[in-house]
């Protein structure tokens, strides 16, 4: 049998059940389509992928290209609409099977289903490769409720077993492709090699034993695990991290901090299956329950939030870090999201869209699910979250070092550039 293996968010050889399934046949082609629609702008003026995340993804693709070459394979990288690009391949080459990691985001599910309908004579196989649990483990879970309910429903279900890295692959099938991976140096290196090096270096320290105390910081050495960019691109799997965490606990002991790392992997898991169940509702203004929030979209307010030019210097510092680096702490994300929804009264989707563009560790289900959570249209039984911005600044930046690092000049005195009559109001100092 001849198999076409389609890469999505599984850019690695190690612990890749989808690749293992594809490698059982006699001939194999490995392909990845860069969706060109990600580089267009939506109604909020945001791209589906900005230059910082694109650089990290290019680095990840280059790393995988080199790893596959060592096994005698070419990573065929193409650009366009995934549905059209893959349909063209299937029309012009003979394949018996198409394999990919199971999709959880509505767009990926849609083009996959359309291909299945278009090519009924080909077997289409999805494999759980980006989650801790398989589809059978969560099939009875209810994703309209809380995360706590999801955890209870999982019960004692075991994590997916680690899959060995393949030593060989079937004979390669050549396709036409273009190599478009020429990354420039960045602050974070993408790819499975860099991801595994980071995994090793993190657990070589004792940072995991104090993670619960540092996780809410805005910055600092090893205050966060740093796994999220590699998870989002599939350079690391959550099972790899969970297994290394278990080894660390055996060597150094388990505590609240080590348990919290697994707890946050479970949050990611929850949002993956939440996104798969709710489909288009993940992106709906009214969320999963059809309750429209009392917010709207003001371009000027959005611009000021995006550029870090609001009356709150803690928000400004966070937004400027995000704009320049593509990174932002978990606490920082909650602060700026609460500001956009509650203080600025903006449509939560414009914030989620900007995060989509900027974040190196962008994960569709986690990003949009968390924004729904803050906006009160998602899985939060409390109906949204509203943070006191002054209190957040006092708690997490008491010495103002973070704000001093990212903010120059005085914060804006108002949330609008113009008053009711259209006259300019006070702006931030240059």
Identify the residue ranges that each predicted region occupies.
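Glycine/tryptophan-enriched, flexible segments
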Residues: 141-289, 393-430
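N-terminal beta-strand-loop-alpha-helix module at the start
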Residues: 1-72, 425-430
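Active-site-proximal binding-pocket segments
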Residues: 223-412
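Beta-rich, aromatic/charged-enriched effector core domains that present basic-aromatic interfaces
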Residues: 82-193, 372-374, 390, 404
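General small-molecule cofactor/ligand-binding pocket signal
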Residues: 29, 74-78, 123-127
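Residues at alpha-helix caps and immediate loop-helix transition turns in enzyme cores, especially N-
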Residues: 15-18, 111-112, 351
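An acidic- and aromatic-residue-enriched active-site/binding cleft used to recognize and process polar
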Residues: 8-10, 33, 80, 103-105, ...
């Amino acid at each position: 049998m001849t198999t076409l293996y389609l890469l999505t968010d599984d850019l690695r050889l190690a612990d890749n059940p989808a690749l293992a399934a594809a490698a059982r046949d006699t001939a194999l082609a490995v392909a990845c389509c860069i969706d060109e629609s990600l580089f267009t702008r939506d109604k909020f003026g945001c791209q589906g992928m900005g230059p910082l995340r694109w650089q990290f993804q290019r680095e990840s693709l280059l790393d995988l290209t080199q790893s596959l070459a060592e096994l005698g394979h070419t990573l065929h990288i193409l650009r366009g609409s995934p549905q059209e690009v893959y349909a063209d391949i299937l029309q012009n080459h003979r394949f018996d099977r198409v394999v990919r990691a199971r999709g959880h985001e509505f767009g990926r599910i849609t083009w996959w289903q359309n291909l299945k309908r278009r090519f009924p004579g080909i077997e289409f196989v999805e494999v759980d490769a980006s989650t801790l649990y398989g589809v059978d483990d969560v099939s009875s879970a209810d994703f309209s409720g809380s995360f706590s309910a999801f955890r209870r429903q999982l019960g004692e279900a075991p994590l997916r077993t680690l899959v060995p890295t393949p030593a060989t692959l079937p004979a390669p099938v050549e396709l036409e492709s273009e190599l478009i991976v020429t990354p420039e140096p960045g602050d974070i290196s993408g790819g499975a090699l860099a991801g595994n090096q980071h995994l090793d270096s993190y657990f070589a320290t004792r940072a995991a034993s104090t993670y619960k105390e540092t996780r809410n910081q805005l910055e600092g050495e090893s205050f966060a695990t740093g796994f999220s960019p590699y998870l989002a691109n599939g350079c690391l799997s959550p099972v790899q991290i969970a297994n290394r965490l278990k080894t660390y606990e055996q060597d150094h002991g388990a505590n609240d901090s080590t348990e919290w790392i697994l707890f946050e992997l479970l949050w990611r898991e929850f949002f993956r299956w939440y996104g798969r169940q709710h489909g288009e509702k993940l992106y709906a203004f009214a969320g999963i329950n059809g309750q429209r929030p009392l917010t709207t979209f003001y371009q000027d307010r959005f611009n000021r939030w995006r550029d870090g030019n609001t009356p709150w210097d803690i928000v400004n510092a966070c937004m400027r870090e995000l704009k320049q680096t593509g990174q932002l702490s978990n606490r920082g994300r909650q602060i700026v999201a609460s500001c956009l929804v509650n203080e600025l009264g903006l449509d939560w989707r414009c914030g989620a869209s900007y995060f989509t563009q900027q974040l190196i560790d962008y994960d569709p289900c986690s990003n949009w699910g968390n924004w729904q959570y803050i906006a009160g249209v998602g899985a939060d039984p409390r109906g949204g979250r509203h943070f006191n911005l002054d209190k957040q600044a006092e708690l997490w930046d008491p010495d103002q070092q973070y704000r001093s690092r990212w903010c120059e000049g005085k914060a804006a005195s108002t949330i609008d550039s113009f008053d009711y009559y259209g006259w300019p109001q006070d702006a931030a100092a240059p």
